[in-house]
Amino acid sequence: MPVKPNFNPDYLYFVTTSAVKHVHLFRQDVIKRIIVDSLYHLRTTRQMELFVFVIMPNHVHIIVHFSEEYPLSDVMRDFKKFTARQIYRQFQADGNTRILDVLSREGERVKLEYKVWDDGYDARDVYSIEFLQQKMD
């Protein structure tokens, strides 16, 4: 997914980020909790206003407002880095070798120990109430 090149702190954004290879990593409640806890943490530490989020089996949608001090790219980097580490550790603790093999194999391609998220993210300006309502439904 491409990174949004221009960031306007006056806008709300509809952001989507996906699991590597669109693998269904986010089915377990414990994995969802890692994502939710991280989003709530970013609300306070990165002055991010979180309006709505939904966790699908292989991707996450969020509607957020970011501050100038902590732009979208920085927040997404921190979110993905932290959650990747926690999600990988959880799969290790669970002994889920099938998922660990996929994450390790994808990591090797880019000279990392593992890879949980696809590169980049998609961010769209929430340009109207209708667009916002459509994404919230």
Regions flagged by a language model, labelled:
Residues M1-D137:
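Short catalytic/metal-binding and nucleic-acid-binding patches
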